[in-house]
Amino acid sequence: MGDLFPGSMVIATDLSPIQPVDVPPNVHFYVDDSADLWDFAHKFDYIHTRSTVGCWASFQSQIAEQAFDALEPGGWFESQEVDGNVCCDDDTLDPTGPVSAWFNDLLVASEHVQRPAILGATLKEVYEKVGFVDIHQRTVKMPIGGWARDARLKEVGYMWEANLLDGLGGFSYQLFNRAFNRTPAEIELCLVDVRQHLGDPRTHAYMPGFIVWGRKPYPGEVSGAAVEGK
């Protein structure tokens, strides 16, 4: 973004100092918790969040309302989320199998620790409640594995499967221990079956994705206008 818009200032935050050092001079990374009070000295024209499912007790109060306040009138807020539930349109996913069981555990555990794994499906409503206007929503399907006929979706599916496999432990260990008091050995035993079944090409599973963006109204502008997209 810094290279594409050299006249802009790009600020990004993360909980850990994991970002690259070699960046354009107008890009700045800060170690910060976005759930804390935002104390930026200036307003923004564009604020963006992505893949924050499970991070917030309340996306509305901790993020969306702060983003609204931090934007200039006419500025845009955009969120991209893939929710933590698994879907299937043709009954090829076993509802009692290890993949379905793991996703169900993820949803239950995330609610137990008050960090919901369902966020994307609520974004548009949150934007409306906060007061954004000209709200748009696009929904996408993130295939798990290479089962899709479309070449692009097939490639996305392979990458998404690899992403899930790489993150299974990180998604599971602390969450399942805190919610269910499971030991690392018990969790790993469960994950063996999940890894074996996750990319089965006979299973046409996917995860729902949501892209929502809206504009902070100008003074005197009516709020709540929304546009549905695909």
Q: Regions from the language model: what does each represent?
A:
Residues M1-P6:
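Conserved SAM-binding loop of SAM-dependent methyltransferases across substrates and taxa
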Residues M9-D14:
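Conserved SAM-binding motif I beta-strand of class I
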Residues P25-D36:
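Conserved SAM-binding strand-loop segment of SAM-dependent methyltransferases
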Residues A35-I47:
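A short acidic, Gly/Pro-enriched loop at the edge of an enzyme's catalytic core
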Residues Y46-V53, Q80:
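Residues lining the SAM
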Residues Q60-W76:
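A short glycine-rich, Lys/Arg-flanked "PGG" loop and its adjoining helix->strand segment in the class I
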Residues W76-G170:
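Conserved catalytic/acceptor-binding region of the Class I
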Residues V130-K230:
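C-terminal lobe and adjacent flexible extensions of AdoMet/dcAdoMet transferase-like proteins
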